[in-house]
Regions:
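A short amphipathic helical element positioned immediately N-terminal to and/or at the very start
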Residues: 3-12, 82
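Short amphipathic alpha-helices in soluble, non-transmembrane regions
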Residues: 82-86, 170-173, 243-254
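Membrane-proximal extracellular/periplasmic loop immediately following the first transmembrane helix
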Residues: 36-120, 125-127
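Short amphipathic alpha-helical coupling segments at ligand-binding clamshell hinges
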Residues: 74-82, 153-154, 239-247
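Short beta-strand boundary microenvironments
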Residues: 88-178, 183-206, 214-222
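"Rare, low-scoring activations can occur
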Residues: 160-165, 184-284
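Hydrophobic alpha-helical transmembrane segments of multi-pass inner-membrane transport and secretion
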Residues: 14-40, 280-302
């Protein structure tokens, strides 16, 4: 405290004799104000809720290969059987199978839907089974839950951001407004409810997404040999530091289907960390905090 007061007295004595010092301090004040405000915005954006929850969520790592006892099995068959087995595990609260649809994941697909033929919105496609919303604890319409949405690409649930984009361009837009595939005015896509606002990563804005529910028939017909992702939520009472180890040792062998093997269950918090490191999200806050600290030290020592 004495050190700070001493420096303030020195600054004041110099101010009385040199107007340039005042200008210099004013400039430093402006820069510091800008940096602190920017840092505050970054931290607020970084730590505000994402709109979904990844606590107790895991992603299966699967391997397909080796000798097969049933040559008629497709990848879709294997994944669906593994999903059914996983859903029956006592420690599992919810599970879902999806294609290119995980949050904080580099694999994405996009498409456009239109209202009144010409009002188009482009958004990320979420192709998944009904358990997806429960796995990530997203918010959907209790009157029109995602799990009850008819399967297929003729029925869609819009995320709040996608709904808002339509409404911005068409003020009368509602859940009863019929949609069509962009460029194909003869197609009809019926809306279900809405998915609450969420962001796919820390510094992203609310994500516009089209949610399509897939049943077994659709998956077997259109995703025969595609690579799928399986995620699941563990009951809080069953989760813990040893769950991953116990899962690999005890549960994973029960999920194997022919030549599909479950190699690991990765906590989704690790997926989040890897994604943020790759995108430099954590560095944005840390680097700016270092600059602010450096300037503060220089002000009091200079």
């Amino acid at each position: 405290m004495k050190f700070i007061l001493h420096n303030l007295r020195m600054i004041w004595s110099r101010l009385r004799s040199n107007g340039w010092v005042l200008a210099e301090l004013f400039l430093v004040f402006v820069v510091m104000w800008f940096l602190c405000d920017s840092l505050g915005c970054l931290k607020y954006t970084f730590y505000r809720p994402l709109g979904y929850n990844i606590d107790h969520v895991y992603r299966l790592t699967t391997i397909i290969g080796g000798a097969t006892s049933d040559t008629t099995l497709t990848n879709a068959d294997r994944y669906l059987r593994a999903l059914k087995k996983l859903e029956q595990e006592p420690s599992v609260e919810a599970a879902a199978l999806c294609y290119w649809s995980l949050p904080m994941h580099g694999s994405n697909s996009y498409s456009s839907l239109a209202a009144q033929d010409t009002i188009g919105v482009n958004a990320r496609i979420i192709n998944t089974t009904g358990g997806y919303i429960n796995v990530f604890r997203m918010s959907d319409d209790p009157q029109r839950p995602f799990v009850e949405t008819p399967s297929g690409w003729d029925n869609v649930m819009l995320s709040q951001a996608a709904f808002d984009r339509f409404q911005k361009r068409m003020p009368t837009f509602s859940l009863d407004t019929p949609l069509s595939k962009y460029g194909d005015s003869t197609s009809v896509v019926t809306q279900g409810g809405k998915i609450g606002a969420f962001r796919t990563y820390r510094y992203g804005s609310d994500a516009p997404c089209f949610f399509y529910r897939m049943d077994e028939n659709l998956i077997k017909r259109h995703f025969t040999d595609e690579w799928a992702q399986i995620v699941f939520r563990v009951k809080p009472a069953a989760d813990g530091p040893d769950y991953r180890t116990n899962f690999i040792r005890e549960i994973a062998p029960r999920l194997d289907v022919d030549d599909l093997f479950v190699a690991d269950a990765v906590p989704y918090t690790e997926q989040q960390l890897q994604f943020e490191v790759m995108n430099g999200d954590t560095d944005k806050v840390n680097s700016q905090a270092i600059v602010v600290l450096f300037l503060l030290v220089n002000v009091f020592l200079g």
